[in-house]
Amino acid sequence: LKIRASYGRMGDDGGASTYPQTAIAYQLDTDGKIGYIYNGTFITGVSATAIPNPNLTWYTSDTYNAGIDFDLWNGKLSGTLEVYKRKRKGLLATSSAVIPGTVGASLPQENLESDQTYGWEISLGHRNNIAGVSYWVNGQISATKNRWDYHLDGQAGNSMENWYRNDVSGRNKDIWFTYEEGGRFTNYDQIRYHNTTGANFGQSTLPGDYWYKDWNGDGVVNDNDRHPMATYNLPVFNYGITMGAEWKGIDLSMNWQGAAGVYNSYDEVFTEVGPFNGGAVLDIYTDRWHTVNATDDPWNPNTQWVSGLYPATGHSFSTGSTGIKNTSYIRLKTLELGYTLPKTWLVKAGIKNLRIYVNAYNLLTFTGLDNIDPERPGRQGLSLIHIS
């Protein structure tokens, strides 16, 4: 059993580049608005892009870590429990202070903001030998979150505006504030008599279009109805399992990998009839709401419709929850089968060791998504592997 703790401080140059703001930078005017007239001729001038800041420094990154390592019963059970935190100070930001236009340049970036990343990790392992078969199993799960300690917040106009802003001091980062899908219009009566106004409707609203919930109940769907729907960028949980076995030179190993509490935006894929810049395959194009007869008038309330996955002509409100999908998954990343030839077979050939093996990658994926690779960052995320 081992108990450990550590602390470290280092400089972090992430995002700082070469600090061009430490010197005055100029740009050539291309609009003919800045310059001087000499002998009746306009001479193009240059303008300062920012006031220099010679006091910029790297971020300061403080890292804290504590953990417990254990190994029991001669290695039959081992594991690690760990918690960690990284606090960064001096992140670059530009002050919102107002300066007169006569200054002729914008304010420079300063070391103003701070944030932290924190989380935990648990790993467990087991190995044994039973009746000549040796095997091992290792599992790992971790959770990570990001949080602003201090963010240069602009002044909110009211409490609602402060509520749905993402980058606010003391709040976790990367929260998706958006409109919650309530369903789909299936006929013109639903469109005509729906009990909300605002963003749910437009002149082109048709059966098959999505509608969004009036979250605050004021009868109007607008920015005040946005609320936390998901997180993005980092999964809440990452996990993996590796296992293997060996018997008389035959070995089999596999590696499973997954994530949970992770969301991606597939606006184009789920809300447009012709995704991928109009290059969608025919099956995607035809699986949409459409009139029974191609010549029927879609604006006639008596027209009959055939339902499908996609709206008839797409939906302008693609920023709602319709395109945001839970991309939690577990995937068989690698599978390998091998055989190590006995050394007695190899001596005469002068070979010390010889192992023959076959392996495969990304054989199986279990996820709630259909036809989309959950590891794809979003947008054009069609998958070419087996999805269950």
Predicted regions and their residues:
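Conserved small-residue
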Residues: 17-19, 113, 129-233, 273, ...
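Active-site-adjacent bridging/hinge elements
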Residues: 38-45, 93-98, 216-221, 305-314
